Regions:
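Short coil/turn segments at secondary-structure boundaries
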Residues: 94-96, 103-106, 142-146, 175-178, ...
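Hydrophobic/aromatic beta-strand patches that form the interior of the parallel beta-sheet core
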Residues: 89, 129-131, 194, 210-213
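AAA+ P-loop NTPase catalytic core
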Residues: 1-161
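Conserved nucleotide-binding/hydrolysis micro-motifs of P-loop NTPases
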Residues: 86, 96-98, 134-138, 169-171, ...
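Conserved catalytic/switch belt of AAA+ P-loop NTPases
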Residues: 111-112, 146-155, 160-196, 201, ...
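Short, glycine/polar-rich helix-capping loops at beta-to-alpha or helix-loop-helix junctions
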Residues: 116-119, 197-205
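A short helix-turn-beta junction within AAA+ P-loop NTPase domains corresponding to the substrate/partner-engaging
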Residues: 126-127, 201-227
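Short, structurally constrained coil/turn elements
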Residues: 122-124, 187, 205
Length: 227
């Protein structure tokens, strides 16, 4: 019986490997025909993404003394992509990881035709409706801010509205569980929604949005920030 079991396992794994190899070969062939064969190389997509982020960051205007480090660069790039596509986003990290600064830089650079750089004049202006979360927050208050942002968007011209939930993690301390309202408004929202938090929320919220979790900065990032 042991021999038969071992033979069955060997046959199963052989079949599985053969199937995966066939699927991978077919996928690679389709990938090559699509014109993106260069991305098949290890790390090619990551390098391309880093170059796009670098170009994006080079067109951002920041105040003197603000370092365009990795945290701020990634936050800005992902934040802009999510806002333009109305994808909910949570930026999670300790104080000092450029969460609030990210939104300040986005709103000061994306002003439509009044943007300080030509690069951003092709994008719509960003209008932020902010709600400061706290342990006293209520689901009704969050819902009202959301509806107000939606009404603004309905009458806006060449403008994208973003609901900013600042310190959203603090609302989890409320016994009334006000963040349960996010379960519905995070599903295909007509506006962009961004939440900033010092710690991760429960999976019921996080799984409904893109999430950036800022870890400890690298030595290179610390050096760049201090320069």
């Amino acid at each position: 019986l042991a021999t038969e079991g071992a033979a069955a396992r060997e046959a199963y794994w052989s079949k599985l490997v053969a199937t995966l190899t066939y699927q991978r070969t077919g996928s690679e062939a389709k990938f090559a025909k699509s014109g993106f064969a260069g991305f098949a190389q290890d790390g090619a997509f990551a390098r391309c993404l880093a170059q796009v982020q670098k170009r994006f960051a080079a067109n951002v205007e920041v105040e003197p003394g603000v370092a365009m480090n990795q945290a701020l660069t990634e936050n800005l790039f992902v934040g802009l992509v999510c806002i333009l596509n109305k994808l909910p986003l949570f930026i999670v990290g300790k104080p000092g990881t450029s969460k609030t600064l990210t939104m300040q830089v986005i709103t000061s650079n994306l002003l439509g035709q009044q943007s300080p750089r030509e690069f951003f004049r092709k994008f719509p202006a960003i209008h932020v409706v902010q709600y400061q979360c706290s342990p006293m927050s209520s689901s009704d208050a969050i819902q009202r801010q959301y509806e107000m942002a939606c009404r603004y968007q309905a009458h806006a011209h060449d403008t994208l509205t973003c609901l900013l939930l600042d310190e959203v993690g603090l609302a989890e301390h409320s016994p009334d569980m006000p963040l349960k309202v996010l379960h519905s408004i995070l599903v295909h929202p007509p506006i962009a929604i961004i939440g900033l938090s010092n710690w991760a929320l429960d999976p019921a919220k996080m799984n409904r949005a893109v999430c950036i979790r800022r870890t400890e900065p690298s030595p290179l990032d610390i050096e760049l920030t201090a320069a």
